[in-house]
Amino acid sequence: MSSSRNFDLEYDDYKERRNAAGMGSRASSRNGGRFKPIDKEKEKEKKEIGDYGLPKNEYKMQGYDERSSDVGADPLASVRTLRNNLRVMSLEHRDKDEPVKSHLCQSACDDLSKAEKQLVDLSHKRSDAVVRGDSRQAEQIAKDMDRVKSDAIRNAYSDLMMEDGTMKAFGVNSKWTPDKNPMPSDDWKPMTPMKPRKRAETPKGRKTESRQSNRGNNDNGDQRMTSKATTRSPERRVIPTEPSKPKTTRKNQRLSTIGHVPEAIPVVDTPLPGGSTVQDDPYKMPTYVGRCPHCQLTESGLGRAGGMEKHFAKYCKVMTSCKYCMKLTMVSQLTDHLIYRCEFLQDTMEACNDCGLAIEKEDQKRGGSHPMCRGRRPPTGAQWCPLCTIAVEDNEENWREHLLNNCYNNQRRDGPEKDPWEMKQEQEDILLGAKEKKKREMEEEERLKKEAEIRRQQQQVVVNNTGYPGKMIDADKLVVALQEIQERKKAEKKKKLKDIEKET
């Protein structure tokens, strides 16, 4: 009994302290039962997220800034230019055996290609808005194009792969761009502190006096001069042991050449690029003669700056230009260029299993062949000419002889090689002329059919009116026939008159 009483007293004391602390309302439940702790899961469900008062800071990029530039003015052109540059870098890294950088550049090209499609669609929409006269929509679409361009350049991470100057041309200023000429780590050395300079010590036996003390009270300088003369030690005279040489009298450079006959300037044999020599006479006009190292053509103008490059581009018969990437290459190396080095084809061709010339991989997988296939390998020590498929001994002299004299399919034998764009334009003009000629022939045929139909209808009208299915009379032919009849009658009448006169 005593224990239960003590417990009741303690419980009453607990309730008083609890009510004094303000917890009575929480302890009393709706059902009036005793207070029980809530489960943790229910407590989480009832707890609401409060406002903690955190500032809403906008995200700002550090080290990456964009601005307007000449190259980045047109979003579509800037994206295409950047994609082409990254594609070239991907090929260069692949040739240098750097697969990671090559993969990064190629993935950036893929992202930029997707952005290019979006920009093309937006450009069409903007053109339609301009045609309709909706300037607000056109301006909004232009802003969307700039946003797509900025997002594409930033998400492609091109600033991590391209140089600082190239990215600034696109309006991107990033501190993450690699330095073009980084300083090697071995060359860096910490700066050493400069050693303090030592002050010159004054001799002990010499007195130091200021200039003010040396000056006299008078303004005249005689006293100063006399004091210096007295303190100066007498000069020591040196007696020469050898007689001095006479000095040469210097003359003016122009006066010294008066009356002096210059020596003849020798004629120098200047070697040409091909190995031959030409007499370069300084008293005559320059010849600018040069020799092509490939076709051995010696011509005036090849020695001039840019003359040899122009000769290689259109006139050298030993070289040709790839019809896919427009790069110059030797004819003897054209097959290897198409298979391994052409940037436009990008490993889409391989060597033919039958002849060894270039063929598309898809055609060879399907079992097809190319039009110039000879069906067998070239003889030992020779190669097929990629222009005419004639076997040529694989050395420089035989290739030169073949391309200058024997290759019937060498376009440069008859003159300079035409620009592929000009050739394409000529082909289009020929096709257009043939199409127009066919159109004129069809129009002429249609006109003749209409005339025949009109004549048939006129003949049918005559038949319906007269009941006689006669032929239509040509008025011109009728007039000619009547004139012939009249001329014949006149001739007969004159003949009769002459006969009458003879009888009389």
Curated annotation (Swiss-Prot):
Disulfide links within the chain: none
Taxonomic superkingdom: Eukaryota
Biased composition annotated in UniProt, kind: Polar residues: 213-232
InterPro entries attached to this UniProt entry: CEP104-like, CEP104_Znf
Comp. bias (Basic and acidic residues): 36-50, 199-212
Region annotation (Disordered) ranges: 1-59, 171-255
Name by which UniProt lists this protein: Uncharacterized protein C40H1.3
